[in-house]
Amino acid sequence: MTPGAIAILSLSMSTDAFAAAVSRGASHRPGVVSAVKAGFVFGVIEAITPLIGWSLGLVAADLVKEVDHWIAFGLLTIVGGKMIWEATRSQDHHEEGAAPKRSNRWALIATAVGTSIDAAAVGVGLAFIGANIWVIAASIGFTTFVCTTVGMLIGKTVGQRFGKMAELIGGLALVGLGAMILIQHTGVLKTQLG
């Protein structure tokens, strides 16, 4: 993957955590130290989950070489579509999945794990295209750390509206990234231009 694609993927994967952090920041009104701690928890978990998915994907990669780009496209489209759907749902439905209002460690960890499940699915897809998972996982983790920290601080002042917009943009970016992988691996663009 190109550095630009890695940056887009990292930002896209961090938007769930950002949205949860804005929600949590709006309800908990954290200080800078609390926001940094939460960012660290989210970043570490978000970096680990694509590694888990990638490991599982490697096991299956040889079995599905002929359709790997379709699998990557499908997984990214499903994850992106889910993010778009959640971002456009009504506020009443969105509240059901919002970050827990309690500020204990376990609620924070549960929220971080919940927002990182999508990264595991993306990790599976990355195994099929032979991407450098270590660079990507580090980039996703760092980006999530920054976005979560900033999101919690923004949540103190702006509230939940900004978080839903970020989730929508992230979902659209993932669908676009999936389409780009499909186009590159099927040669459609080369055929059209050649």
UniProtKB/Swiss-Prot annotation:
The transmembrane residues are 2-22, 40-60, 67-87, 107-129, 133-155, 168-188
Name a GO molecular-function annotation.
manganese ion transmembrane transporter activity
> Major location, coarse class?
membrane
State the membrane topology: Multi-pass membrane protein
Instruction: Say yes or no: keyword Cell membrane present.
Output: yes
> Key word Cytoplasm present in the record?
no
Q: Which GO terms describe its cellular component?
A: plasma membrane
Give the UniProt keywords, A-Z.
Cell inner membrane, Cell membrane, Ion transport, Manganese, Membrane, Transmembrane, Transmembrane helix, Transport
Compartment(s) of residence: Cell inner membrane
In terms of superkingdom, the source organism counts as: Bacteria
- Which HAMAP family does UniProt cross-reference here? MntP_pump
Report the function annotation for this chain: Probably functions as a manganese efflux pump.
Q: Which family does it belong to?
A: Belongs to the MntP (TC 9.B.29) family.
UniProt xrefs under PANTHER family? MANGANESE EFFLUX PUMP MNTP-RELATED
- What is the protein named? Putative manganese efflux pump MntP
